[in-house]
């Protein structure tokens, strides 16, 4: 998906700050063709899913804001889409979409791989390869836990759904036989 999708998605998506966070990850993931659980993994690592998180202690003088810890180095480009620091902090869906936009840019520029995920935190600097790999490994570990949790939940729900279908089939069969 093209990076230019951000303004269109944000214009058509009028979700308030009170929107269900899962919906924001799901929709941003769908629009940017990124697994929502990967986006959530980044937010867990970056801020423990804290919408108003602010980290102003970067060595290079930049700050990271919102649940996705979007770096202030992106503010110039985001201004073109009417996305400000305040919007990132006050609208969790804008924050998630912006994080997805950053990650999608990395995937488009450097390939869809764990190194690009690591660049979400470090950028492409060759001086930060070790830090990038460590960050990517942390995200991978969180992502694996979320995937395992999703699988476990679906396995637990599947038998219940199967029983409901058996009951419906039995009810339909008895209705059709005139009983």
What is the meaning of each model-derived region?
Residues 12-16:
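N-terminal signal peptide c-region/cleavage motif recognized by signal peptidases
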Residues 161-179:
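Low-complexity, Gly/Ser/Thr/Pro-rich intrinsically disordered linker/tail segments
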